[in-house]
Design a protein with these regions (language model features):
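Short, catalytically relevant binding-site loops at active-site mouths
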Residues: 5-8, 28-30
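Short Gly/Thr/Asp-enriched flexible loops that form oxyanion-binding sites at enzyme active sites
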Residues: 8-17, 78
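A short helix-loop-beta submotif of the ANL/AMP-binding
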Residues: 17-20, 86
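Short, glycine/charge-rich flexible loops or terminal/linker lids adjacent to PRPP-binding catalytic cores
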Residues: 19-61
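PRPP-dependent phosphoribosyltransferase catalytic core
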Residues: 75-122
Length: 122
């Protein structure tokens, strides 16, 4: 799950599926050794991190977040998973701001994407 509203939805899915809940957090929020990646946002730059021991090699990962706009955060999350030698199998977003193209870009890169609500971003 991507910080922080993604935690609300992903924790419920994790519980129902009986799968681990792994947090992708903003910089300097995790206490142990981390993988880190910087990425561009519409309004600047950001960093997200994951504990190095959260993912094992060849894990299949479902990334859940509340919203996708341009897809920058989702792409950064994918890179963090890949650094850990795991694989993103799908994304779930509660809201897709469809005219900003993030969800479409993930699909073009052969990711499975489910959006619960499509809403214009402008």
């Amino acid at each position: 799950a991507i910080e922080s509203r993604g935690f609300v939805f992903a924790s419920a899915v994790s519980y129902i599926l009986k799968k681990p809940f792994i947090m992708l957090r903003k910089k300097n929020k995790l206490p142990a050794d981390v993988h880190s990646i910087d990425f561009e946002l519409e309004y600047g730059t950001a960093t997200i991190e994951v504990h190095k021991d959260s993912l094992d090699e060849n894990d299949n990962v479902l990334i859940i977040d509340d919203l996708i706009a341009t897809g920058g955060t989702a792409e950064a999350a994918t890179k963090l998973v890949e650094i850990s030698k795991s694989k993103v199998t799908a994304f779930i977003f509660v809201i897709n701001l469809f005219d900003l193209g993030g969800s479409d870009n993930l699909v073009k890169n052969n990711y499975k994407v489910e959006n619960l609500i499509d809403f214009p971003g402008h």
